[in-house]
């Protein structure tokens, strides 16, 4: 499993972030933050797994990418682990508590069609997406990487 995970992470060169975090108690970002555009490379050092390198597209999900790049630059993710692994489906990380209940200080709007945002991205193998609770706008810092096509998400 660990080797397969490393191979998946190495092969993941172009990753897309679509909106979605399992954070339930957090403050909504109230200030107007300038959103990014274009592609960005991010690097996250995951405890016990190594470094993830990903390219994310701010033109498709500007709020999500702006948040992810900010957290990555702040080294928020470094040293965290994957707290949820479902073999053949996905791996989830980005929780400072390590149990699926934590996140960063702010939540962001989910950038996906069910939330009124035109977004052509699909959860295909290697896609990086934000985890969220039932609230469409609850994404924070938790993310997941799909291990196989999961276009029903």
Which residues fall in each region the model found?
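Cyclophilin-like peptidyl-prolyl cis-trans isomerases
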Residues: 5-8, 19-153
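Bacterial Sec-type N-terminal signal peptides, specifically the leucine/valine-rich hydrophobic h-region
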Residues: 14-17
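N-terminal secretory signal peptides that target proteins for export/translocation
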Residues: 1-2
């Amino acid at each position: 499993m660990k080797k397969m995970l490393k191979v998946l992470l190495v092969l993941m060169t172009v990753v897309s972030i679509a909106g979605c975090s399992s954070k339930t108690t957090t403050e909504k970002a109230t200030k107007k933050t300038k959103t990014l555009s274009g592609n960005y490379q991010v690097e996250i050092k995951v405890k016990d797994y190594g470094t993830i390198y990903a390219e994310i597209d701010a033109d498709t999900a500007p709020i999500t990418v702006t948040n992810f790049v900010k957290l990555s630059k702040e080294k928020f993710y470094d040293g965290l682990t994957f707290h949820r692994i479902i073999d053949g489906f996905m791996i989830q990380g980005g929780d400072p508590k390590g149990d699926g209940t934590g996140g960063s200080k702010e939540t962001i709007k989910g950038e996906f069609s069910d939330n009124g945002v035109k977004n052509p991205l699909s959860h295909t193998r290697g896609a990086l997406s934000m985890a969220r609770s039932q609230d469409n706008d609850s994404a924070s810092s938790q993310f997941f990487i799909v291990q196989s096509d999961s276009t029903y998400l």
